[in-house]
Amino acid sequence: MAHDEDDRRNLELFQALLIGIEWEYEVARLEFIDEIQDLMGRWRGPRPNFHQLFPRAEVIEWLLSDALNTMREKYQPGLRFIKFVLNSGYRDRPRFENGEYVVARTTPIHRAAIMRERHAVSWDMAIEALFEIYDRYDLNYVDAETGLTHFHVACMSNCVYAARQFIHNGLSPDYYPDERIDPPLHLALKYHEFNFERTPMIKMLLRRGANPNLATAEGTRPLHVICRKFYDGAELAQQFFKLNDELRQSVDCNVADVWGRTPLQWAVASLSPELIDLLVYRGADWDGFVFPDQSLILEAYERQHRLRYRFGFKLKLAMRARLVDEYLYDHDYELTASDATKIMELLARHRVFNVLSELEEQVLTDLELVENARNVQIKQGLTLYDALRLRPKELERRLEPRRLYAFWKHKNLYQLNTFGEMWLCEKLLCEKMMRGFMRSWGLASFMELNRYVWPFEAAEVFVDNLMNENLWSLCKAVHWREEPADEESDSEEQQQPDAEQPRRGSFDFRD
C-alpha cells in the first residue's frame, strides 16, 4: 500500500511538472529533464504513460534528442531519461503519409550516432535503448543530410540484435546506398575498440554474407580499415582472417585503394609490427612494398592523436617504431633517410622526445622512485632501475626493443607507486631506446648537410651532443618535403624512394 501511495504521488508530481512548459524551447525541455532526475530515481512502480501524457509525439522525440546533449555530464542524466522512457513502455509510432511509411526521417538514433564519442560505452547503451523505442526494423530510417541509416548505426554501435533484425527484414549485409556512409562491415570494424567487444557484430555480418573484400567508392576494403587501427589492429586482423577461414572465404591482402595504398602500407604507417608480420604471413606482397608517403603517415597521426595522453602510449609508439624498423631491415627493405624522417615526424608530433639530462636528473634523484624501480624486473639480470641509469648505447646492447615492448604489454610499469613515477619512467625509456635510431640518421643527415666535408670523428662528437629532438629537426631540415594536402599521388615516382637519398650504411647503430 505504501508503494502504491508513493507511485500515486510520483505520478501527480510528474503531471504537475508538465504544466506550463513551452516544449518548443530547448532550454525548457532541458530544465524538465533535469527536474525529474530525482523523481526517476525513486520511482518504483509502473512508469507514467508517455503516449497519454504527451499527445504530440514530436515532443517525446525532442526530449530524447535533448537527453543526448547531457550524456557528457556527471551521472549521465540523459541516459537515465532514455531508459526511463523505455521502461514506461513508450514505443515510437511510424509516420504514414500518402499510403506509405515515411523513412526519410532524422531520429534520436541518428543524432546519437553523430554525437557518439569513441571509447564511450555509455553511448552504445543509449543507442541500444533507443533501438528498443524505435523498434520497427522493417523501416530503415535515413537521415537525409548525412545518409546515415538505422542499420548503419546498429553496426557501428554493436547493437547486434537490431542489425540482425534489419537483415532478417530484407536488408543486405553489404547495404551501401550512399557514398557518404561506409558499408556495415567497414563501420563495425572501424568502431571496434581495443577495450570493448565488437567481434559478435563482425561475426554476424560475415556469417550472413557480408563481402570481406567489398570496396567503397574510394576503394577502401575491410582490411584497410583494420590496418589503420593503432591499438587492436593485429588482434582484430587475426580474428578477421580466422572468421573468413571458417567461412572458406579469401581476403585479398594486396588490394590497393584509389590512392594506391595497400593494407601493408597502412600497417607500416600505423607502426604495427605484429600486423605487418601477419599480413606477410597471409600473402602480402613484400617484394613490391613501397614505404608509405607523408600524407599516409600524417593521417595515421590524426587517427592516433586522441590517444596521446593515455599512459604508456608514447613508449608503445616508440617501441613499435623500433620494431617496424627492425622488421623492414630483416626483410631486406632498407629505410631511406626520408623514410626514417617520416617516422620521426610521427614521434615528434606525439611529443615523444624530451631532454635526456633533465629526465635523468628528475628520475635518479627521486629516492622513492629509485627504490621502487629496483624491485621491477624487466628481464633476468636487468631491473627497471638499471635501464633508467644506463647510457643509451649500453642499454640498447642489453635490452632489445622487443623485450621492452613485451614488458610494456604486460603493464609492468604499473608496479610503481604513482602515475607521476610511471610517466617519468616512460619518458626516460622512450628517450633512451630511440637514441640509436635517432643518432644514426642524424649523423647521416649531418654529413649530407655539410656535404661530407667534416671528418667523420668530429661529426660523431657533434651529433653525440644533440638531443633526439635536435636530431629530428636536423633530419627534417634535410629530408622532409611538405606535400599539398589535396594533391593525389598519381605517379609511381611520388611513392618510390629517392635513389639519391643516403641510407644508413656505415652509420648503422646495429654495427
Task: Give names to the regions the model predicted.
Residues 86-94, 128-138, 164-173, 203-211, ...:
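Ankyrin repeat domain, specifically the short helix-to-loop turn at the C-terminus of the second helix
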Residues 105, 146-147, 180-181, 219-220, ...:
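Start-of-repeat signature of ankyrin repeats
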Residues 111-123, 153-159, 187-198, 225-234, ...:
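Ankyrin repeat A-helix N-terminal signature
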